Amino acid sequence: MSFPKYKPSRLSPLPETLDPAEYNISPETRRAQAERLAIRAQLKREYLLQYNDPNRRGLIENPALLRWAYARTTNVYPNFRPTPKNSLMGALYGFGPLIFIYYIIKTERDRKEKLIQEGKLDRTFQLSY
């Protein structure tokens, strides 16, 4: 019984287990993978030596984490792309609350002023508006 050759469709890509690049790896790719694995093992060993040091003082600094934190916080503008959505959301979050609070205060004062002019508001002990 022979099975038909698997053809990936638009909605269902080729599974990783059937990917020929998974098994037919060139020697250069294998060498690069081995180098990356060696670097990872060396960094892990250095971290564990620092972590398990009984005479450790202070924090252990992870350079990759420091780079990530720098890129995430202080280095925002080189990676920021202004778009219409960003601009609209900035204006909405910046001016929206101010306009909302202004509207609430204005309508409350207008309502109170109308009641004062009609004489329906009891202003006992009122020294200000």
UniProtKB/Swiss-Prot annotation:
Q: Which residues form each disulfide bond in the chain?
A: none
Q: Which residues carry this modification: Phosphoserine?
A: S26
Cellular component per GO, a single term: respiratory chain complex I
Stretches the record annotates as Disordered: 1-26
Kindly give the membrane topology term recorded for this protein. Single-pass membrane protein
- What role is this protein assigned? Accessory subunit of the mitochondrial membrane respiratory chain NADH dehydrogenase (Complex I), that is believed not to be involved in catalysis. Complex I functions in the transfer of electrons from NADH to the respiratory chain. The immediate electron acceptor for the enzyme is believed to be ubiquinone.
Q: Record's family?
A: Belongs to the complex I NDUFB4 subunit family.
**What's the protein name?**
NADH dehydrogenase [ubiquinone] 1 beta subcomplex subunit 4
- Report the source organism: Pongo pygmaeus (Bornean orangutan)
| Native organism taxonomy | Eukaryota, Metazoa, Chordata, Craniata, Vertebrata
